[in-house]
Amino acid sequence: MVNEYKRIVLLRGLECINKHYFSLFKSLLARDLNLERDNQEQYTTIQIANMMEEKFPADSGLGKLIAFCEEVPALRKRAEILKKERSEVTGETSLEKNGQEAGPATPTSTTSHMLASERGETSATQEETSTAQAGTSTAQARTSTAQAGTSTAQKRKIMREEETGVKKSKAAKEPDQPPCCEEPTARCQSPILHSSSSASSNIPSAKNQKSQPQNQNIPRGAVLHSEPLTVMVLTATDPFEYESPEHEVKNMLHATVATVSQYFHVKVFNINLKEKFTKKNFIIISNYFESKGILEINETSSVLEAAPDQMIEVPNSIIRNANASPKICDIQKGTSGAVFYGVFTLHKKTVNRKNTIYEIKDGSGSIEVVGSGKWHNINCKEGDKLHLFCFHLKTIDRQPKLVCGEHSFIKISKRGNVPKEPAKEEDHHHGPKQVMVLKVTEPFTYDLKEDKRMFHATVATETEFFRVKVFDTALKSKFIPRNIIAISDYFGCNGFLEIYRASCVSDVNVNPTMVISNTLRQRANATPKISYLFSQARGTFVSGEYLVNKKTERNKFIYYGIGDDTGKMEVVVYGRLTNVRCEPGSKLRLVCFELTSTEDGWQLRSVRHSYMQVINARK
């Protein structure tokens, strides 16, 4: 039973709460678990679950976790789920101790009961309903079952076999299981089957999966999943036409959905379900098929809106992985016939008589996409983004290529105008935002009295760039040029993104590929012309590199005259920046200087977070 408690703590508790609440939970249990304060953020959910099992042997710390969730308004639904799971474990144990028989309407598996209680559509509840309608008591059901030749003890044994996976292994050996000859074994199996049935109440069990005979609507080797699965919709395309093998024109759409532990690509062949496949919508799907790791929903499938108490919490890491595109170098290493999805930059387009070759490119390499039929010579040009859905990897002329198939789809994002100014965001943002580091300063002390330190950085997405203030210098190791990171819980203020804690920045370990155009890089690193600064509003913060042609020291201030081919301006520094030695003829790098004006003209004035560096001193 202790193992059951730990399973609930880990898989239904710690893995389902976000990073902020997990950090809060660790902080509250730091003394009980003897967590080192400096390394508190480093402990993983598995490590914490192991410590809780050792510290609280009675229930593996489940009571502590429930109490914590009840005190946090956003986690109260999670507390109810945990209490329901706990009651199932204690109820099941007492049932076994009393030697009671579990009837067909009383499943002993915690997972299957959670499905029944949360969705109300398991076969067990249906049997209970039909038994009640027939007016048959439990004793009568047992008697009739015994008369049919199956004793209650045998039923109990079968249920135990199902819980331990025996039935799944038997099903794999049945002769009517269609072979998967087109893909390696790992790709033939459903992603759902790769997870333990105890991992989540949302994962269908093997007893409700059936191999289907081949026909015109069901792909060969498809597996039917009749048990309900609760998912959150992440993305969905508009419906589009495709030609079936029978040369009929039909409609479908692609979608991406996620559970608490994994994500799935979905083919939806019933376009009347489009309204349900809306971003961030929670739905319950059943009677769907799985083929080569992709879920398929047709007219016989059930798609229902989830009730408020059936909604799930999808971790940000799952969402990031679902939205990430594979590296092209990894695609090239894939198995022939493998299916790929992703967003890529069009590098070159070659139109042939029967097909079009779209060469896509990222930081790891390039590959050709072969488009024929409706994907022949589509309206796109170099620099556009191609969002590929369901493209097949094939070897043509000894080279791996992505080839369109029956259900392939391409969504085009036109290249927009490259911004000249850094993007501005205001207030608190939870994120995460995935960016590439372009440029970074050295850490410096901006408050000499309290020894406060920071550094500046420039980062970019594929469409815009940002100025960043980082107030935790331990993050310098992550802010390395060309490194791709995810930032969260940051603040937007005066044209800068402000990051205060190390926990707000994480490495992007899954498919860290981002294509930043040369034009965007140039704009992000460019120095604004002085004539352009004359047209800007007072209070604008300026960064750039300028040639110094004059220097004047007056009281506690230093005045530098700077200029370019469009005009001249004055830079005023005071305090700590007066210690930077710079003479006329040198070049100054200015970061975060405020544009202001006096009676004599425009000035760039140093402020609390300004940074100044001499690029090349006069010889």
Curated annotation (Swiss-Prot):
Q: What induces it?
A: By beta interferon. By macrophage differentiation factors. During myocyte differentiation. By different bacterial infections such as Staphylococcus aureus or Mycobacterium bovis.
Q: What is this protein's tissue specificity according to the annotation?
A: Present in osteoblasts (at protein level).
Q: Where are sequence repeat segments found?
A: 134-140, 141-147, 148-154
Domain annotation Pyrin: ranges: 1-88
What is recorded about the domains? The 2 HIN-200 domains are able to interact with RUNX2.
Q: Per the similarity annotation, which family is this?
A: Belongs to the HIN-200 family.
Assembly: Interacts with UBTF. Interacts with RUNX2. Interacts with ID1, ID2 and ID3. Interacts with STING.
The protein here is known as Interferon-activable protein 204
Q: Which organism is it from?
A: Mus musculus
